[in-house]
Structures are given as structure tokens and as C-alpha cells.
Amino acid sequence: MPKLEEIEDYDDIDNMDMDLAELDPTLNTPIAPKITPTVVRSQDIEEEERKKQYAGSNKEMISFINPQTGKVEESAPITKQELDEVKKFQVLYPCYFDKNRSHKEGRRVPIEMAVENPLAKTISDAVREYGLLSIFEGDKCHPQDFGNPGRIRVLLKEEGKLVPSASKFSGGKRQLMKLVAEYLQKHPTTVESLRELPYGPDFDNIEFKKIPKVKGFKMNDIVPLHSPYLWGHPMTKSIYEAPKIEAPEKQFKAPKNKFKVVRR
């Protein structure tokens, strides 16, 4: 039986492209259709014009962590071929470092190195601190952890060789995950950590708070604002609602047979 630390080939399911809208087409997420804002700002108009400019072309936009500012920024439009190259990057999901999950449920580091409520943004901060090229995908989620959206793609190798920025990572992804786990332990997740995530104007009035955990349901109590756990969506709303108590049906009593006695 191999030890947990010796397992490396686990990218088959973890590398799936799954976003929140794919779980439920009616769910409004940062990549699903947005609710039209009542106040139209100039920057919103500029953003819309920029999207129209590349509509119908063979180019897409990706988000990345600016190593100088630490903020999530959008790249210049890239071609489908370039996007295919990006998909060869190593993938890190928050559930890899979740101490409340078993290996079968998505954890990939030893339990003593795992933490409570890991967030993709904190993982990206760790990767940036080690000087690695990374891409932040805030709308992607692990199939077993759809309530905690976000993942990081990290460039370690090209054509089987370590890239210059990853020259110290001869241990590959296992070594990287160990260092990321150490960073997460030094930077525990709090409600204030949610303010560091990039959000659009649709989230301006949403309160940062912990959410109640549901018994028997694997979930975190600190999740990004665009998590379906915070939206009261039908997909997850039922886990917070108390089951309706059905009134017992009234038993039907058969009528008594009445006899009339006639005396002669």
C-alpha cells in the first residue's frame, strides 16, 4: 500500500475544467450571465467594448498573479494554442490542503500539514512568494469541492525540464505542495482574508461572514463570495432549510352498522 506522500498521479480528475455554471446553468457566477447593474459606470462600458472587440475571435483572457503587486490581473488576449499550453501547468486546488477532508475526498498533503478553510488566493500568494509563474482561475472548482471556487495553475516544467523560475523545485509538485502547506499554516484563513479576493461590482453589498456548517455535508465555513453556499441558490439552499414536518394522515373510521328492531 503506497503512502500518501508517494502518490503523484492524481491529475486525471483534478485537472478537469469545471466552473460553477457547469454545475447548474441557472447559477449566476462571474462567468455566467450577470445581472445588469442599475448604475452604468464608464469603466463598465469600456470593459464591455473590450469584450466585444475580441468576440468571435480565437482569443481568450486569463487571470494571473502580478508578482510585483500580488493582485489578480487579466492578461492580454491569448490564442487557443497558447491556452492549450497553459493547461499543461500544474494545478493546485484548495481542497488539497483541507484538514477536514480525507485523501479520497480530495486532500493531497499529510493531515498534519493541512489547514482549516484553505483559499485559492492564499495558495496563489504562496506560489508568488516562491517566484513561480502562476495563473489564478477564480471561477474553476474541484468536482468534490464545488462550494470553494478557485484554483491555481503553476508552471514548473517545459518539455520535461524545470523552467528557470522553478530551478529549486527538483522535487516537483510534491515539493511545491509541501511549501505551500507551510505557507498556509503561517497564514491561517480568517473572514478578513475574503477581502483579498478580486470581486466585481455585483458583490459590493455582500457581507463578509462565516456560514453555518451542515451536519453530514463536507464544506468550509469561510468561502469566497461567489460560492453557491452564500447565494441561497436552489442547488444548495435546501441544505440550510429545516425539513418540513408532514402532518400525520387522519385514520378513516368505518361507520358502525345500525339495525332497527321492529316489534310485532
Curated annotation (Swiss-Prot):
Keywords noted in UniProt: Cytoplasm, Ribonucleoprotein, RNA-binding, Signal recognition particle
Naturally occurring in which organism (per UniProt): Candida glabrata (strain ATCC 2001 / BCRC 20586 / JCM 3761 / NBRC 0622 / NRRL Y-65 / CBS 138) (Yeast)
Claim: Chaperone is one of the keywords in the record: no
Gene (name only): SEC65
Family: Belongs to the SRP19 family.
Domain of life: Eukaryota
Localization (cell): Cytoplasm
Protein name as it appears in the record: Signal recognition particle SEC65 subunit
One Pfam family, short name: SRP19
Main localisation: cytoplasm
Protein purpose: Signal-recognition-particle assembly has a crucial role in targeting secretory proteins to the rough endoplasmic reticulum membrane. It must be involved intimately in the translocation of a wide variety of protein substrates.
InterPro entries for this protein: Signal_recog_particle_SRP19, SRP19-like_sf
SUBUNIT field: Fungal signal recognition particle consists of a 7S RNA molecule (scR1) and at least six protein subunits: SRP72, SRP68, SRP54, SEC65, SRP21 and SRP14.
Molecular function as annotated in GO: 7S RNA binding
Disulfide bonds: none
High-level lineage: Eukaryota, Fungi, Dikarya, Ascomycota, Saccharomycotina
GO cellular component term of the entry, any: signal recognition particle, endoplasmic reticulum targeting
Gene Ontology process terms (BP): SRP-dependent cotranslational protein targeting to membrane, signal sequence recognition
